[in-house]
C-alpha cells in the first residue's frame, strides 16, 4: 500500500543561458532545519515562532503531520506561530499518517511515534514506499516498540506500545536519518540511549535538541541522550545550503558570473561540498556571521571558475550525499577525472541516483564508470551545444542538477518533469530565470 504520485509531469524547456549574472540572493529556509523546527521544536509544551520556514512540499508534509498529532500552526506574514500541547499530549491514535515523498519526515517521525506510543499506519508515496525501513524498525523494536512491516518497506504499522527503554546502539550504516530516529526515540524512552557512529553524519538533530535544552552529550562519535525538561524557543531557519548548490553551480559554470548568497546555513558538516568545490579550484568564499539556534549562518561569494577533478574519499561521502549529483555535473566540465568513493547509499534515495547521474551524463557526452561502489566522472567537457533530453526519474535533485547543465548549452535543454522540484525548491525558477532563457 502506498499513496500515488501527485506530480503533474510538467516539462521544462531551457533555450540557452545568459553569459553575465551579477546579483545577490536570499534563499528559502533549509529543508533539514525546517523539518526539525517542527519535529523537535514542537516536542515541549508551549508557543514559539519559526521564521523563514521552507515552503517545500516535504516540509509542508511535516507541518501537516504535526497538526494531525495535535500541534496548532498558524501561518502569518513574517513567521509561523506554533502552539504545541507537548509530546505527552500528542494524539495517541490516528488512522494513517502520510509522509508523501519525504524520507526525513518518515524516519524522524517514526522515532517520535514509537516513543510517544501512537497507534497508526505510516505510509508514503510510490517512491518512499520502496526505500529501506528495516534500518529504523529493527532498533526501534529492540527498544520496545511494536512496529510491523512487509519485507523492508512501508507501510509501517505502529501498534502503540509507547514504553521504550534506552538502547546502546552502534550504527550499521552512515545515515543521519537513522541516527536521528534513534535519538528521538531515545529522548522519549526510559533510561539512557547511546548511539555510536562508524563515521560522522549531519548533526542537525543533535543541535536542535541541545538548543531546546535537551539532555544530550556528544563525545567524538558517541552520542548519549535521555529524557529531560525541554523548552519552547523561537527558531530561525537559515537559507538552504543544498538548494544553494544549484545556484552556485550556475555561477561556476557561467561565462561571467559573480553572485552573493546571504544568510545561508553554514553547518560544518553541510558545507563540506563547498570545501570540495574550492579544492577543485572554484572561486568561492564563505564567511560566518552569526549563530541561530545552534547553527552557523553566513554569506557565500561565488565567481565563474575553471576546475580540476579530485578524489573524494568515503569518509566525506555521507556529508555530501545530496550534493553528489550536482558535483558530478560540475566535475564533467572540470579537467581530469573525479572519483566519489562508496556511493551505494545513492541507490536508496528518491530515485537510484547513481543510475540517474550516469544516464543523464551519458546524454551530455560524458563518460562515467561505477567500480566497486565508486563513481568515476571523466571530465573535459567544455560545451554541450546540442539539444538534450534530461530524465529526472521524478527526483528533485536530478532535475535541479541537470538544469544547471544548460549553462554550457546554447541549444535547447528539455527536462521531462520539473514539478518534482517542489519537493525541495519550489519557486526555484524565480532564481534560475537570471541564468537561463526559460519557456
Swiss-Prot record:
Keyword Membrane appears in the UniProt entry: no
Record has Nuclease as a keyword: no
UniProt superkingdom: Bacteria
Residues that coordinate or bind 3-phosphoshikimate: 31-32, 36, 175, 177, 322, 349
GO molecular function terms attached to this record: 3-phosphoshikimate 1-carboxyvinyltransferase activity
Main location: cytoplasm
Active site: 322 (proton acceptor)
InterPro entries registered for this protein in UniProt: Enolpyruvate_Tfrase_dom, Enolpyruvate_Tfrase_sf, EPSP_synthase, EPSP_synthase_CS, RNA3'P_cycl/enolpyr_Trfase_a/b
Annotated GO CC locations: cytoplasm
Enzyme Commission number(s) of this protein: 2.5.1.19
Binding-site residues, phosphoenolpyruvate: 31, 103, 131, 177, 353, 397
Keyword annotations from UniProtKB, A to Z: Amino-acid biosynthesis, Aromatic amino acid biosynthesis, Cytoplasm, Transferase
Subcellular location as annotated: Cytoplasm
Catalytic activity: 3-phosphoshikimate + phosphoenolpyruvate = 5-O-(1-carboxyvinyl)-3-phosphoshikimate + phosphate
Recorded family membership: Belongs to the EPSP synthase family.
Function: Catalyzes the transfer of the enolpyruvyl moiety of phosphoenolpyruvate (PEP) to the 5-hydroxyl of shikimate-3-phosphate (S3P) to produce enolpyruvyl shikimate-3-phosphate and inorganic phosphate.
PANTHER family on file: AROM/DEHYDROQUINATE SYNTHASE, PENTAFUNCTIONAL AROM POLYPEPTIDE
Summary of subunit composition and partner proteins: Monomer.
Record's protein name: 3-phosphoshikimate 1-carboxyvinyltransferase
Species of origin: Clostridium tetani (strain Massachusetts / E88)
Gene: aroA
Amino acid at each position: 500500500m502506498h499513496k500515488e504520485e501527485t506530480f503533474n509531469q510538467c516539462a521544462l524547456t531551457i533555450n540557452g543561458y545568459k553569459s553575465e549574472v551579477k546579483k545577490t540572493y536570499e534563499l528559502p529556509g533549509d529543508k533539514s532545519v525546517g523539518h526539525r523546527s517542527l519535529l523537535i521544536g514542537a516536542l515541549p509544551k508551549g508557543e514559539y515562532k519559526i521564521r523563514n520556514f521552507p515552503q517545500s512540499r516535504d516540509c509542508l508534509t511535516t507541518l501537516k503531520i504535526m497538526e494531525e498529532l495535535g500541534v496548532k500552526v498558524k501561518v502569518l506574514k513574517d513567521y509561523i506561530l506554533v502552539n504545541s500541547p507537548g509530546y505527552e499530549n500528542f494524539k495517541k491514535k490516528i488512522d494513517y499518517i502520510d509522509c508523501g515523498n519525504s524520507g526525513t519526515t518518515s524516519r524522524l517521525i517514526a522515532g517520535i511515534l514509537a516513543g510517544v506510543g501512537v497507534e497508526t499506519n505510516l505510509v508514503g508515496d510510490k517512491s518512499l514506499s520502496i526505500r529501506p525501513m528495516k534500518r529504523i524498525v529493527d532498533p526501534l523494536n529492540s527498544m520496545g516498540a511494536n512496529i510491523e512491516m512487509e519485507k523492508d518497506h512501508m507501510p509501517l504499522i505502529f501498534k502503540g506500545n509507547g514504553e521504550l527503554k534506552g538502547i546502546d546502539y552502534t550504527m550499521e550504516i552512515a545515515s543521519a536519518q537513522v541516527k536521528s530516529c534513534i535519538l528521538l526515540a531515545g529522548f522519549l524512552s526510559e533510561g539512557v540511549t547511546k548511539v555510536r557512529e562508524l563515521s560522522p553524519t549531519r548533526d542537525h538533530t543533535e543541535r536542535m535538541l541541545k538548543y531546546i535544552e535537551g539532555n544530550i552529550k556528544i563525545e567524538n562519535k558517541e552520542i548519549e541522550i535521555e529524557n529531560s525538561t525541554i523548552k519552547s524557543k523561537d527558531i530561525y531557519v537559515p537559507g538552504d545550503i543544498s538548494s544553494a548548490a544549484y545556484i552556485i553551480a550556475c555561477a561556476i559554470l557561467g561565462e561571467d558570473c559573480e553572485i552573493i548568497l546571504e544568510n545561508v546555513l553554514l553547518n560544518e558538516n553541510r558545507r563540506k561540498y563547498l570545501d570540495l568545490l574550492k579544492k577543485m579550484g572554484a572561486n568561492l568564499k564563505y564567511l560566518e556571521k552569526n549563530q541561530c539556534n545552534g547553527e552557523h549562518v553566513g554569506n557565500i561569494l561565488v565567481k565563474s571558475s575553471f576546475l580540476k577533478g579530485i578524489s573524494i574519499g568515503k569518509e566525506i561521502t555521507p556529508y555530501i550525499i545530496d550534493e553528489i549529483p550536482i558535483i558530478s555535473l560540475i566535475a564533467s566540465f572540470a579537467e581530469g577525472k573525479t572519483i566519489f568513493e562508496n556511493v551505494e547509499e545513492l541507490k536508496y534515495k528518491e530515485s537510484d541516483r547513481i543510475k540517474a547521474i550516469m544516464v543523464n551524463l551519458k546524454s551530455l557526452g560524458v563518460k562515467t564508470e561505477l567500480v566497486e561502489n565508486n563513481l568515476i566522472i571523466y571530465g573535459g567537457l567544455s560545451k554541450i551545444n546540442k539539444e538534450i533530453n534530461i530524465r529526472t526519474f521524478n527526483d528533485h535533485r536530478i532535475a535541479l542538477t541537470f538544469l544547471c547543465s544548460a549553462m554550457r548549452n546554447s541549444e535547447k535543454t528539455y527536462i521531462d518533469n520539473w514539478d518534482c522540484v517542489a519537493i525541495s525548491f519550489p519557486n526555484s525558477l524565480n532564481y534560475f530565470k537570471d541564468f537561463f532563457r526559460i519557456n
